[in-house]
């Protein structure tokens, strides 16, 4: 018997299985066979605070107070809001804090918000804060000056392992999202997969994107793996 000199890792096997499932299901997985309903939500400008910064802005011992639970279990919009100040004293007031607290403070804005503040902000996955601009946060009890932490959140989809298997994708892959609405049907590319066994299937796009595709009046949404380029180059 001939022995294979190169072993296949578990992650490679999982990827091959997902690809095979994706081929069986077709480039756009059938919604009727999906393990979970596809939900697309607009993520408006918001802030994630560290406990340290929460206490600077709202007073020693401050805790986030729940105003509304979010779609993902354990996450919520807090009653607390702060003002964001950019260069040349440009300000956006009443920006909602989301909970629970995180290890690092992070500000998530749409493109039009960054223009209003006078900031050049990169598109990043949540938590990737190196080489990002900072800003000033103003609360009722104090001020925090961030040297980094302002991002435009990359459009992304939260998926469980069952969802990934259904769509034929893996953590970090980029999918396409087709949104059908009257007069402005659009396909959004580069929807980053964020796999976690504890999440519900949910796509997040920002306010600019949601308005551009008229998400509030969408008649259909479909998530699918992009097909490889079939064009012939000379």
Say what each PLM segment does:
Residues 1-36:
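Protein-protein interaction and targeting regions used for scaffolding, dimerization, and localization
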Residues 17-25, 58-62, 217, 225:
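Structural signal for hydrophobic packing residues in well-ordered secondary-structure cores
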């Amino acid at each position: 018997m001939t022995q294979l000199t190169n072993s296949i890792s578990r992650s490679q096997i999982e990827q091959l299985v997902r690809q095979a499932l994706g081929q069986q299901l077709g480039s756009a997985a059938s919604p009727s066979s999906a393990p979970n309903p596809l939900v697309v939500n607009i993520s408006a400008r918001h802030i994630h605070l560290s406990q340290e910064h929460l206490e600077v802005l709202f007073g020693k011992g401050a805790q986030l107070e729940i105003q509304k639970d979010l779609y993902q279990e354990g996450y919520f919009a807090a009653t607390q809001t702060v003002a964001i100040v950019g260069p040349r004293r440009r300000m956006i007031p009443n920006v909602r804090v989301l909970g629970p607290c995180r290890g690092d403070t992070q500000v998530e804005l749409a493109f039009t918000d960054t223009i209003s503040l006078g900031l050049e902000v990169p598109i990043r996955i949540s938590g990737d804060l190196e080489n990002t601009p900072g800003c000033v946060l103003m609360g009722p009890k104090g001020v925090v000056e961030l040297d980094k932490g302002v991002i435009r959140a990359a459009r992304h989809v939260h998926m469980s392992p069952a969802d990934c298997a259904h769509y034929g994708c893996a953590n970090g892959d980029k999918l396409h999202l087709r949104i059908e609405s009257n007069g402005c049907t659009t396909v959004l590319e580069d929807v980053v997969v964020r796999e976690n066994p504890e999440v519900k299937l949910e796509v997040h796009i920002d306010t600019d994107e949601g308005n551009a595709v008229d998400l509030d009046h969408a008649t259909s949404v479909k998530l699918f793996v992009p097909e490889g380029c079939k064009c012939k180059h000379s």
